[in-house]
């Protein structure tokens, strides 16, 4: 017997809502010409030792990366190439775009979780990720990876295989969004038919990538709870004593930023010795054939 209180069209309306929700649960396949892509890495060559900075995964603990940049900049140490994964990719993109540590710090202190996290009801995760993409693209003035002031590698992982992908070309914000898409929390990011998730799935601190990009001295910043074995490929590993909290908890950003600055300052003597030794032992760079002399 039909319930007279239920409109006859309600089941059809519910079905329509579910169908529309189903359409919204599939990640968009990004196939535009500016979609992020991986190309063979070209080592950077300079007449002095090349410094690589690797900023690791760690959610909101990634605010410590900003403190590390402050300490390095104060000491006159300027990275030549940058590698970022997950929250580290956000800071790495801003640094590679030419922002100074004070500018990144000011942006971080203004940041609210709602600026980055767009929660959804339907979908393969609780957070869609578009706000994060837009935030990064605005910070880098909508420049693609290859047009930033410094070489930048953004690390993501293929969802099906967990294999590492190193994005060095294309839309910076979209690459960072893929790198930070924590499985089951964020929607995966689909690029040219392949779904990508948080780069920390493949490597939380991919120090070896900086070597492949030509770094003579690799500085790795590990903000993960358990530490990352991949950081061992670095010459100097900075491990800030961050506050343990949910990866989306921004309430400890001041403490984490200070922890990053303190840890980097402690590492400065070791780093300065390494830089001096590398400069003394570096062979001269030979001019390329045909180059004007």
Question: Where do the protein language model's features map onto the residues?
Answer:
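Patatin-like phospholipase
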Residues: 2-6, 19-82, 94-293
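Hydrophobic helical h-region of N-terminal Sec-dependent signal peptides
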Residues: 11-20
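Gly/Ala-rich beta-loop-alpha elbow adjacent to hydrolase catalytic centers
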Residues: 84, 88
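Long, contiguous secondary-structure blocks with strong helical propensity
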Residues: 89-93
């Amino acid at each position: 017997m039909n319930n007279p209180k239920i409109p006859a069209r309600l089941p059809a309306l519910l079905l329509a809502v579910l169908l529309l929700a189903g359409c919204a649960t599939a990640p968009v396949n990004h196939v535009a010409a500016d979609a992020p892509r991986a190309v063979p890495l070209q080592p950077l060559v300079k007449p002095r030792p090349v410094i690589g900075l690797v900023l690791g995964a760690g959610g909101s603990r990634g605010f410590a990366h900003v403190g590390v940049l402050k300490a390095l900049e104060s000491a006159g140490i300027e990275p030549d190439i940058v590698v970022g994964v997950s929250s580290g990719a956000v800071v790495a993109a801003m640094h590679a775009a030419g922002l100074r540590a004070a500018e990144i710090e000011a942006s971080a202190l203004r940041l609210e979780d709602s600026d980055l996290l767009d929660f959804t009801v339907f979908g393969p995760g609780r957070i869609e990720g578009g706000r994060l993409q837009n935030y990064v693209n605005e910070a880098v003035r909508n420049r693609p990876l290859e047009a930033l002031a410094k070489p930048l590698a953004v690390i993501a992982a293929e969802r099906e295989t967990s294999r590492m992908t190193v994005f060095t070309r294309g839309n910076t914000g979209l690459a960072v969004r893929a790198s930070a898409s924590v499985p089951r929390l964020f929607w995966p990011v689909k690029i040219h038919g392949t779904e990508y998730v948080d780069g920390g799935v493949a490597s939380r601190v991919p120090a070896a990538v900086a070597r492949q990009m030509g770094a003579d001295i690799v500085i790795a910043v590990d903000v993960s709870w358990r530490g990352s074995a991949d950081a061992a490929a670095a010459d100097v590993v900075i491990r800030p004593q961050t506050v343990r909290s949910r990866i989306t908890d921004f309430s400890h950003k001041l403490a984490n930023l200070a922890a990053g600055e303190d840890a980097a300052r402690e590492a400065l003597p070791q780093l300065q010795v390494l830089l001096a030794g590398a400069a003394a032992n570096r062979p001269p760079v030979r001019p390329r054939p045909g180059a004007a002399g």
